[in-house]
């Protein structure tokens, strides 16, 4: 069916500039610009047209709001306190103690996860996924690396999977020092505590699609546990449509005392790695200006849209990078496996409290100590993860085979995709933005069709297509390639 949006000229809403946005989703303050000029306004679809309406972020429904309210800062504090009590959780630490070391922590996490799963009426299962890592970088002797995974099986589309992880291993200054205490309260007991709290909440609320909540190991030695998890999922052809990595999400205070307790950064890679995208497609992406519309960045935009609101009390600041300088994270292995993945990290880091021997020098306390963790902030980050995961799982799957016609030299845009046979899909939306805008700014519901012709030049805007469920939830947008 052909849908011509020009017929909807009565739905004109002019685009908003910086002073009109509903809430801020970027970390830096906006740079002053001429608000009267559509060419300078990042939130404008230039040139102005009478197509579509201004995009309004997806609000949480009553069920999601109630779930978000279940996230407990007290539970997160108790979990971090317990993880710190194991002394060190270094990947190479003692294996034969029930009170100290990585295995003691693993067993406790698994025990707690199983308690949560017992409340799920069989919809949540817990697995300890282990393998023996031979001698390798930062691994001087063979060691068992274990991931604790709680899987909430989807009620309607269980083959579609979303993953969230935090890593439970820790370290001090010397990455091979597995004897000294390494509390790892922020890095990354905070992310592990969020994964566990999400498991507790989701055990009582079955999602439509499957959600895996993981406490992974071997991160500090080289992302071993998460890479193994990603490759295992890839080797079994698991359809992972999104992965969230929570790492260093426990403090709102930076090393200069600056505080930003209501913002979380979301790191999102640009062009996918060559292991996930062919060289031909990578070249095409650059040719058509799609370097800012990788699956990872669409996932980050989705998180900013559904999780930055008054239910979570947070803003999501998208950072257009794989990760911070000189650092890496557990989302990397998922990206290399071809899965969309992003990393959440606190807005202002204090490096005296990361990867440090516990000590005091010149009045400065070093070490990843629990006294530096903001439990309310960590709980709010958990709410961002919950809102994102639940909104992903309740929405229809992303549209498939989305293409734009690049064979005709004109000022219309022809986009097509495969219509889903799912009864949950109510319609599709075209979203778009200026090429200099970070987030989608405009949308047009085109019904349950698989082809649309828009009186907007593909040269001037960036398009995406997303599926809309009968329940109101919307999928992440898919960027169209020529086809």
From Swiss-Prot:
It is found in: Secreted. Residues 1-18 form the signal peptide. One of its GO terms (biological process) is proteolysis. The keyword Glycoprotein applies. Keywords: Glycoprotein, Hydrolase, Metal-binding, Metalloprotease, Protease, Secreted, Signal, Zinc. Its EC number is 3.4.-.-. Zn(2+) 1 binds at residues 167, 187, 247. Binds 2 Zn(2+) ions per subunit. SUPFAM superfamilies: Zn-dependent exopeptidases (SSF53187). Zn(2+) 2 binds at residues 187, 220. Glycans are attached at residues 96, 121, 235, 310, 362, 401, 411, 421. One of its GO terms (cellular component) is extracellular region. The keyword Secreted applies. Disulfide bonds: none annotated. Residues 396-483 form the Fibronectin type-III domain. Its cofactor is Zn(2+). GO terms for molecular function: metal ion binding; metalloexopeptidase activity. It holds the Pfam family Peptidase_M28. PANTHER family: METALLOPEPTIDASE M28 FAMILY MEMBER, PEPTIDASE M28 DOMAIN-CONTAINING PROTEIN. Belongs to the peptidase M28 family. M28B subfamily. This is Probable zinc metalloprotease PTRG_04977.
């Amino acid at each position: 069916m052909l849908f011509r949006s020009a017929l909807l000229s009565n739905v004109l809403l002019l685009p908003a500039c910086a002073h009109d946005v509903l809430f801020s989703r970027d970390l830096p303050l906006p740079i002053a610009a001429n608000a009267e000029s559509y060419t300078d306004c990042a939130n404008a679809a230039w040139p102005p047209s009478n197509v579509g309406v201004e995009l309004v972020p997806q609000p949480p429904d009553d069920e999601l709001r109630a779930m978000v309210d279940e996230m407990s800062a007290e539970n997160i504090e108790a979990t971090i306190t317990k993880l710190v009590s194991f002394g060190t959780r270094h990947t190479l630490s003692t294996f034969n103690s029930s009170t100290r070391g990585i295995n003691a922590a693993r067993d406790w996490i698994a025990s707690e996860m199983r308690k949560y799963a017992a409340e799920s009426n069989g919809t949540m299962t817990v697995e300890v996924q282990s393998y023996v890592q031979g001698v390798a970088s930062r691994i001087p002797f063979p060691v068992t690396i274990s991931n604790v995974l709680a899987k909430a099986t989807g009620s309607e589309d269980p083959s579609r999977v979303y993953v969230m992880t935090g890593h439970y291993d820790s370290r001090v200054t010397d990455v091979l020092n597995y004897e000294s205490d390494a509390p790892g309260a922020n890095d990354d007991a905070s992310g592990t505590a969020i994964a566990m709290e999400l498991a507790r909440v989701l055990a009582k609320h079955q999602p439509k699609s499957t959600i895996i909540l993981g406490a992974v190991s071997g991160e500090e030695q080289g992302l071993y546990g998460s890479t193994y998890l990603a490759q295992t999922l890839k080797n079994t052809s698991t359809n992972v449509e999104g992965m969230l990595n929570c790492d260093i999400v426990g403090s709102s205070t930076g090393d200069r005392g600056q505080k930003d307790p209501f913002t979380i950064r979301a790191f999102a890679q640009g062009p996918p790695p060559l292991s996930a995208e062919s060289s031909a497609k990578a070249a095409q992406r650059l040719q058509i200006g799609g370097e800012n519309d990788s699956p990872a960045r669409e996932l980050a935009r989705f998180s900013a849209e559904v999780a930055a609101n008054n239910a979570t009390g947070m803003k999501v600041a998208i950072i257009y990078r794989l990760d911070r300088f000189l650092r890496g994270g557990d989302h990397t292995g998922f990206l290399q496996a071809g899965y969309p993945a992003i990393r959440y990290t606190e807005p202002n880091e204090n490096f005296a409290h990361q990867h440090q021997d516990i000590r005091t020098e010149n009045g400065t306390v070093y070490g990843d100590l629990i006294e530096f963790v903001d439990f309310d902030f960590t709980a709010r980050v958990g709410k961002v993860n919950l809102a994102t995961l639940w909104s992903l799982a309740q929405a229809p799957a992303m549209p498939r085979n989305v293409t734009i016609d690049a064979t005709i030299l004109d000022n219309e845009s022809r986009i097509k995709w495969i219509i889903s046979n799912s009864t949950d899909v109510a319609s599709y939306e075209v979203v778009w933005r200026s090429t200099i805008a970070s987030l989608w700014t405009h949308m047009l519901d085109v019904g349950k069709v698989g082809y649309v012709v828009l009186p907007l030049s593909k040269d001037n805007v960036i398009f995406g297509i997303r599926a809309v469920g009968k329940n109101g939830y919307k999928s992440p947008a898919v960027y169209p390639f020529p086809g």
